[in-house]
C-alpha cells in the first residue's frame, strides 16, 4: 500500500514537471533558449514555431498554471541570457501573431515592474478597446485576459497594491456589461484586486450598492465577511481594492441601512486606511488631506447620529487623534471637531462633549493661548450651562483662566461674593488678592492645554452671567430677581467704565449687554428697562464691537410697546452712529411700527428693502398687513400664508430666544454683511433725511409736512 502511494506521488510530480502548453514542454523551450545562446542566432526566436506557440498560448489563456510556466521561462531567460535578454525579447515579440499579444508580452517580460511596465499594460488595454473587428463579448474577454495575466504575472505587486485600471476602461465596462452580468463582472474585479478608483469605477460601485440585495452584499463585501469560508476575501482584498472615498461610501451606506453587525471592522479598516495612506502621503496636497479628515469625521458624526454606540465612536476618534502626525497644525482638525461638538451640544449630550474635550489633555497639537483653545474653552462653558450651577461654571473659569486678574474681575463685577460668598457685593483689594479658595469652590481637572494665563474674555463671562440668571430666576422672587439683573448691569457698566484699560476697550463687545437686555425683556417682561439699559450703555461711549448677527438694537425694538415713536427713532439713530448691522427682524419691526403710526409710504419703502435682502418672508402678521395694503407678496410667502390659514394656525415668527446664540460662535456671516450692505442706504436716506434735529427749523417744517414719524 505504501509502495503504491509513493508511486502515485512520483507520477504526479512527473506530470507537473512535464506539463505541456500547446503540446510543448518547458524543457523544450529551455533547450531552444540554450541553443540560441550558443549560436547567437537570435533571429531564429522570431521564426521558432514551438517558442511562439508556447508563449502565445500562455498569453491568450492566462491560467495560473500557464502563467507560472511563462514566468519560469522569463526567469530562465534572464539568468541565461544576461545582457542579451532584451535582444531575445525583441525577436520573440516580433514573431507573436498580433499586436495585443505583443503588448502583453512586452509588458510582462520587462525586467523591472515600474512605470514603463504599467504604461505597456495600459497600452494593451487601450489597444483592446479600440481594436476593430471585435464584438463586445470578445472585447470583454480580451480585457479580462489582459487583467488576469497582469495579476498572475505580478502577484507581489497586485496582491498588496491592487491593479489600477484607466478610467476609460471602467467606462467601457460600465456602459457595455449587460445588467445580468454586472455581479459576475464585479466578482471578477474583486478576484483580481482591481482598484475601485476613478469616476466610472465609483459609478460601477454605486450602481452595485443600489442594485439587488445580492449586488449590494457583494459590493459592500458583506457577502464575504459574514461567511467564515469567505472571510479571508474581506481580510485580503477589501482594504487593497478601496481607496478612502469608495471605502467611506460603503461605511456610510452600512450606517444608513443600520447594518451594524460588522461596523466596527469596517470603521477600523477605514481609520487605518486614512491614518496610513491619505494623511501620511505628502504628495497629496495639504488641503486635500484636510478634506479627507473632515469627510472621515463626517462619517463618524453620521455614525453617532444613527446609533447609540458612543463608546465605539469615541474609541475611533481617539485612535485617529493618536495617529495624527505630531506636527499637524491646529486648523487641520478645527472644523471637524467644531462640527462634532456642535452636534452633541445641540442634542444635549454633555457627557460626550466632555469626553471629547478630555482627549485634548493628551493631544499635543493644541497649545495654550491659541484661537482653537479659546474656542474649545467657550464650548466647555456652553456645555456647563445646562447644569445651571454658578459655582461649577465660575470654578471652571477661575481654573482655566489662571490669573489673579480673574478673581479681581469677578470681584469687581460683584459675582465673586454672589457665587462663593453670601450675597451680591465686593471684597476689598487685599481680601480678594489673599483669598483662599472658598468652601463652595469646586476643584476641576482642567487640561493644561486648555488653560490661559490671562483674565477671561466676554465669551466666558457671558456664559457665567447666563448660568447666574438661570439659577437665581428659580430661587428668587420676581422683584428680587429684577433687582439682581439691575445690579449685575450696573456693576458691569461700572467695571467697563472704571476698570478696563483705555487701550483694551476695543475688545468690548455686546454679548453680555444682549444677555442682560434679554433677561429684562423676556424674564422680567420690562421692555422699558431693556430700552434704558441700551441707551445708558451707549451713553458711556465705549464703541463696542458687534460680534454677532443679532445686535442689541433689534432685541430692544422688537415688539416693544413701552417706547414712543421718538424713542424708537433714537434707537434707529444710535444704530446709524454705531453702523450696526440690520437684520430682517429689525426691518419687520420698523415696517409694522410705521404701519401702526399711519406712515404707509415709509412702511412700504422699508418693506421693499426687506424683500430686496432675499429674506424668505414667513411672518404671518407682516404678510397679512402686506395683503391688506395690496403690496407685492413673493409667491413662497403667499403659499406660507395660505398654509397657515388652512391649518388655522396664525403663526408669527418667534424671535424671543434667537438673540441668545452660542457665544463661542459669535461672528458675522458673509451673507448678513452683504444683506446689511444692500440696505445700507437707509442711513443716508430714511434716517438721515427724516430724523429731525431739535434746533433745525427747516427740518421741523419738513416733518410737519410729511408727518414722517407722527410723534
Swiss-Prot record:
Q: Which gene produces this protein?
A: ATP22
Arranged from A to Z, the UniProt key words for this protein are: Membrane, Mitochondrion, Mitochondrion inner membrane, Transit peptide, Translation regulation
- Kindly list the places in or outside the cell where this protein is found, as annotated in its UniProt entry: Mitochondrion inner membrane
Q: How does it sit in the membrane?
A: Peripheral membrane protein
Superkingdom as given in the UniProt entry: Eukaryota
- The protein in question is named Mitochondrial translation factor ATP22
This chain's function reads: Translation factor specific for subunit 6 of the mitochondrial ATPase. Required for assembly of the CF(0) component of the ATPase.
> What range does the transit peptide cover?
1-28
Gene Ontology molecular functions: translation regulator activity
Which family does the entry's similarity section mention? Belongs to the ATP22 family.
Q: Which GO terms describe its cellular component?
A: mitochondrial inner membrane
Q: Which organism is it from?
A: Kluyveromyces lactis (strain ATCC 8585 / CBS 2359 / DSM 70799 / NBRC 1267 / NRRL Y-1140 / WM37) (Yeast)
